[in-house]
């Protein structure tokens, strides 16, 4: 992964890599829609409507997962102290906007100004396991986190996915340092104790952030004129990342959509004008979204028919900047993907079976079954949530599985929640089983209501269970 020798033979990539070369012959399962956001917010507060950024106004788009990376969040001492006790304002805003749409924040990692958030619709939670969250500081010789990367590694329906949000060194002359930090972040991400410890063997790496690559050779006036005329191709060919990929095999494995939008840096704040200060920095595509798919075998492996056939294909649908957002000197960039996969995990480890009808007047009896391979822990717990929960700790009540068990060892297992913990409301609820060993939700119920018995009629006691 070293970038020292840049004279090795290479070839020039086209606008889009031929994804079809990675397509195996295995049958397709289903598709997930993934929306990736990267934005250097330059210490700005979240005072704007983010509906367009999150594609909330696109009625034709049915998203399953949001992956959001911010750089240069305010990381002063006061901010760090307040974030230790409360959610930071940006995370709170994203949860405010996404939780009513049934997206749950499943992971968050922050290193000073870097923030990485992952949201998923709640029905996917039992099929997503958080493997680890890591931070790699590269500022001040690796001891300061103003530059570097933050990572979430997870298993998605049985596939390994690594997500990296980074902020690389600035300035035209620091290109070699940027590539060195790229390597350093990648080399720091190892996952000992798992069956795929090397990140390069993961099925997907999503890498994005303020990479700070600049446009070489051309002067300021030429770049500005090319942007005005939308002659982006000439500028793209002088982009430092584009040039580096020609001569580096590993970088070539990372794909990117075509840069058909204006350079995203540097703007005067609260405008769409490029830098008019004395420095007059040359515009550049500093904010990027890359991905790398592990090559899959072209034919199905001759394994037992009971073993699911691997199929995992990521297709970019849209790669754009959002010029309307002007609180920062960077414009945000988003990429929307279709992820087709044949699930390697199709049955949740825990299947929740709530009682047919609960009321506010009785303890809540919860039945569940587990798969043979599931290893429970005395620290496992079951949470009761309102539909629209923000994150896994946003429960209204919970019980330790070991403490409140009624029956164990013969499926179904049963636990109860005391009536005093049940909220007096007619909202819809969910039950989630949280595994301490896997640090993830491994079972979730369908939504249900808890009616007040005094308002029930006798003929309602045998109504069908509520549906999603």
UniProtKB/Swiss-Prot annotation:
Annotated transmembrane regions: none
Record has Endoplasmic reticulum as a keyword: yes
Species whose genome carries this gene: Mus musculus (Mouse)
InterPro entries registered for this protein in UniProt: Endo/exonu/phosph_ase_sf, IP5, IPPc, SKICH
Protein name: Inositol polyphosphate 5-phosphatase K
Protein EC: 3.1.3.56, 3.1.3.86, 3.1.3.36
GO BP, one annotated term: positive regulation of DNA-templated transcription
Tissue-by-tissue expression: Expressed in the skeletal muscle and the eye.
């Amino acid at each position: 992964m070293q970038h020292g020798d840049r004279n090795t033979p290479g070839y020039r990539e086209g606008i889009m890599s031929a994804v079809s070369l990675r397509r195996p012959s295995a049958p397709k399962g289903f598709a997930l829609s993934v929306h990736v956001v990267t934005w250097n917010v330059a210490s700005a507060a979240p005072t704007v409507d983010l509906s367009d950024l999150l594609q909330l106004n696109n009625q034709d788009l049915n998203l399953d997962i949001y992956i959001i990376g911010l750089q240069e969040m305010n990381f002063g001492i006061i901010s760090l102290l307040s974030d230790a006790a409360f959610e930071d304002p940006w995370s709170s805003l994203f949860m405010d906007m996404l939780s009513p749409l049934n997206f749950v924040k499943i992971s968050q990692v922050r290193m000073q100004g870097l923030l990485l958030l992952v949201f998923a619709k709640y029905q996917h939670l039992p099929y997503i396991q958080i493997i680890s969250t890591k931070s790699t500081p590269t500022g001040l010789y690796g001891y300061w986190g103003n530059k570097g990367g933050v990572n979430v590694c997870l298993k998605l329906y049985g596939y390994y996915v690594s997500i990296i949000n980074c902020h690389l060194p600035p300035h035209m002359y620091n290109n070699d340092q940027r590539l060195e930090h790229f390597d350093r972040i990648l080399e720091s991400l190892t996952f000992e104790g798992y069956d795929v410890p090397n990140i390069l063997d993961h099925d997907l790496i999503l890498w994005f952030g303020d990479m700070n690559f600049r446009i070489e050779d051309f002067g300021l006036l030429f770049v500005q004129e090319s942007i005005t005329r939308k002659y982006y191709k000439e500028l793209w060919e002088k982009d430092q990342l584009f040039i580096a990929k020609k001569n580096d095999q590993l970088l070539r494995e990372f794909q990117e959509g075509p840069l058909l939008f204006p350079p995203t840096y540097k703007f005067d704040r609260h405008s769409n004008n490029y830098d008019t200060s004395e420095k007059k920095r040359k515009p550049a595509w500093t904010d990027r979204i890359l991905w790398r798919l592990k090559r899959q075998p072209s034919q199905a492996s001759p394994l037992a028919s009971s073993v699911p056939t691997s199929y995992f294909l990521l297709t970019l649908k849209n790669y754009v900047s959002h010029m309307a957002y002007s609180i920062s000197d960077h414009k945000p960039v988003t990429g929307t993907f279709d992820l087709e996969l044949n699930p390697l995990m199709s049955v949740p480890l825990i299947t929740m079976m709530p009682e047919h009808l609960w009321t506010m007047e009785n303890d809540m009896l919860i039945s569940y079954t587990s798969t043979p391979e599931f290893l429970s822990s005395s620290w496992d717990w079951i949470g009761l949530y309102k539909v629209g929960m923000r994150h896994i700790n946003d429960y209204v009540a919970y019980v330790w599985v070991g403490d409140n068990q009624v029956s164990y060892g013969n499926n179904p297992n049963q636990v109860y929640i005391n009536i005093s913990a049940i909220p007096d409301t007619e909202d819809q609820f969910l039950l989630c089983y949280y595994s301490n060993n896997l640090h993830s939700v491994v079972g979730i119920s369908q939504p249900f209501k808890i009616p007040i018995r005094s308002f029930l009629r006798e003929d309602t006691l045998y109504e069908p269970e509520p549906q999603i």
